[in-house]
Amino acid sequence: MHELSLCQSAVEIIQRQAEQHDVKRVTAVWLEIGALSCVEESAVRFSFEIVCHGTVAQGCDLHIVYKPAQAWCWDCSQVVEVHQHDAQCPLCHGERLRVDTGDSLIVKSIEVE
């Protein structure tokens, strides 16, 4: 379950930011998850709650935003959105795609008191 290690990394980032800005409590966190990141939302929510225990983010609201992946289509020379690894180009139905983004988990925003 790699969601646990991803959430641990996210909470470390949140903790560092909280320390740098003298924040006592984080009330909400927005995570951006790439469409090709292979993470389960329920596992992220479960893991996030566990790793937040005893931190400034304990009990905060978790908001998850999915970001479509972008790929370059070698057949029609266009940047397109894809939602799975073995996708076809939605414009020309070509299969020669170079996926450039979409496999990350990013702390997008933090709301504090």
From Swiss-Prot:
Output the InterPro entries linked to this UniProt entry.
HybF, Hydgase_Ni_incorp_HypA/HybF_CS, HypA/HybF
UniProt keyword list: Metal-binding, Nickel, Zinc
Entry's Gene Ontology molecular function annotations: nickel cation binding; zinc ion binding
Top-level lineage group: Bacteria
Can you tell me which residues bind Zn(2+)?
73, 76, 89, 92
Q: Which residues bind Ni(2+)?
A: 2-3
Q: Name one GO biological process term.
A: protein maturation
Give the family this protein belongs to, as stated in its UniProt record: Belongs to the HypA/HybF family. HybF subfamily.
What HAMAP family does the database record attribute to this sequence?
A: HybF_subfam (MF_02099), HypA_HybF (MF_00213)
Biological role stated in the UniProt entry: Involved in the maturation of [NiFe] hydrogenases. Required for nickel insertion into the metal center of the hydrogenase.
The record's PANTHER family line, in alphabetical order, gives: HYDROGENASE MATURATION FACTOR HYBF, HYDROGENASE MATURATION FACTOR HYPA
In Swiss-Prot or TrEMBL terms, this protein is called Hydrogenase maturation factor HybF
- Source species of the chain: Escherichia coli O157:H7
